[in-house]
Every structure is written in C-alpha cells, then in structure tokens.
C-alpha cells in the first residue's frame, strides 16, 4: 500500500491492493505447465539474518548474505572489504554486543534496495562491565538480494570514553 500511495499520491484509506495467487497446477507460460517461482526473501529479512549471524560471530553464515563487492564503513571512515578484517578491527573494542531494533526502513530502486536499521546496542566491555542504550544506525545497500555496502553510525566512542 505504501509503495502505491507514494507513486500516485493517494491517501492509504483510498487505495486497494489485490493479489491473486495462482495454484501451481494452474500455472502456464508459453503453453507449458510451469512451477511459479517463490517470492524472494525481502531485504529487511536478509539484513536481520546477516546481523544475527554477526552477533553470533558466525562469519561463515554471515558471508552468504554478502556480494563479492561487499564493503563495510565504520565510524571514523574505517573501511573493510572482508568480515575477517572488520571483526579483527572490532574485536578489541568489546567482548560481546547485541542490537535492539527500534525500526527498519526499506526503499527500492529497481532490483536494488536500501535498508536502514536503527536502535540501541548493548553488550559487555572487555573489562567485564555492561553497556546498554547506545544509539546506532546501520545503512545497507543490496543488489540482487546480496549486501554490497554496510555503513555504521553509533555512539560507542562516546560511551567508551565515559561521560
């Protein structure tokens, strides 16, 4: 509904979207019985699965969501082209970290998608003290269902240095 409303400038209460699924045994194209394709995984699902794998430090699982042209840009314009480089850089900063999502927003341009995640970080510093409620925003660019770019903004440097 939101995409249709933004395209035609209509109030959501005045727009009706209908989708009719075709039973697989009724699906034909080019005079041949075919199996319809399943819907692709949505960009926000890809991003959340990637971040869950990263939180678990399962780099192998996280890597399946990445394009060969992947790049991550961290605060201070630190740039990495592999998860191994990125995690090596991040390792001395904290013992563990997790994200609480307050919102996830998606926009599309053709087959490309941009996903913004925003929320708070919590975890444990290397000295064993807990941290929480540190703001973050991550921006992801996806092409053909793969992450090509992750940009990270957060308040961790301020939280690490104290009030």
Language-model regions: role of each:
Residues 1-39:
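A domain-level signal for the structural core that forms small-molecule/cofactor-binding pockets
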Residues 4, 17, 50, 61-63, ...:
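Hydrophobic pocket/interface hotspot
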Residues 18-20, 73, 153:
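Solvent-exposed beta-strand sheet faces enriched in polar/charged residues
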Residues 35-68, 163:
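Short, low-complexity N-terminal intrinsically disordered segments enriched in polar/charged residues
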Residues 60-111:
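A solvent-exposed, acidic/Ser-Thr-rich amphipathic alpha-helical stretch
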Residues 111-121:
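A short hydrophobic beta-strand element
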Residues 120-144:
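Exposed beta-sheet edge and beta->alpha loop/turn motif
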Residues 135-163:
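Short beta-strand edge/turn micro-motifs at domain boundaries
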